[in-house]
A protein has these predicted regions:
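Nudix hydrolase/Nudix homology domain
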Residues: 1-33, 91, 161-201
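Long alpha-helical scaffolds
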Residues: 17, 37-40, 117
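Unchanged
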Residues: 99-123, 131-188, 200
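Conserved Nudix-box catalytic region and its N-terminal flanking loop in Nudix hydrolases
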Residues: 77-115
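N-terminal strand-loop-strand
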Residues: 53-93, 121, 125
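Acidic, metal-coordinating catalytic segment for phosphate/diphosphate chemistry
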Residues: 27-70
Length: 201
């Protein structure tokens, strides 16, 4: 394996490990993630792996917002929007999640649609970039939400385990949104997509 390929591989493992340690509640899985983290550290200590400057494996990096992606997919008549039901609270979201380290924003959005909505899509345009905590006081990590509009491609397949179901909802009868989203922002993004606008904070 080329050295650069090894570094890319370790970055991906580190990304998965950090995500697992943050979100997993299974003690066996948590233990496995910690062991993986230790193995990555041991490999990074090898003399032939040199990481220059700030990188994913260092802790003292400049604090910066997290980035998530969301995608608006309308029905063919543009009277309904595709939403997914989150297992965590049995409420609804636009397909989406955290942006991936090794993908650009639109690729991350397509990946989330594939996993959560269970379909391929073609990204058609940028709808907006919003600050999730804009005008809200919080001690949490800031989050920027990048939203795209897309067209569904092909047939549906089974969504990932995080999703209970997917469904098109009429635009005048949207359900309650999951607590992982701000409902006012999700509605703003859907409206902007429908009207061909671009919104931002």
């Amino acid at each position: 394996m080329e050295k650069n390929d090894l570094i890319d591989f370790l970055i991906k493992i580190e990304e998965l490990t950090k995500s697992g340690l943050k979100y997993s509640t299974d003690p066996y899985a948590i233990d496995n993630y910690r062991q993986l983290e230790e193995q990555v550290k041991k490999l990074l200590e090898k003399d032939d792996i040199v990481l220059e400057g700030e990188n994913l494996f260092t802790r003292d990096v400049y604090p910066t917002p997290n980035v998530s992606v969301r995608t608006v997919i309308f029905s063919e008549d543009r009277k309904s929007v595709l939403l997914v039901k989150e297992r965590m609270d049995a409420l609804w979201s636009l397909p989406g999640g955290w942006a991936e380290m090794d993908l650009n924003p639109s690729e991350s959005a397509k990946k989330e649609v594939y996993e959560e909505a269970g379909c391929d899509c073609r990204i058609t345009r940028l709808v907006g970039v919003l600050d999730r905590y804009n005008d809200v006081k919080t001690t949490g990590v800031p989050e920027y939400v990048i939203c795209f509009e897309a067209e569904k491609v092909g047939q549906f397949h089974e969504p990932c385990f995080e999703i209970l179901e997917r469904k098109y909802f009429p635009l005048d009868s949207l359900p309650k949104f999951s607590r992982k989203n701000r409902e006012d922002q999700m509605r703003r993004l859907i409206k902007a997509a429908l009207e061909g606008e671009t919104v931002f904070d």
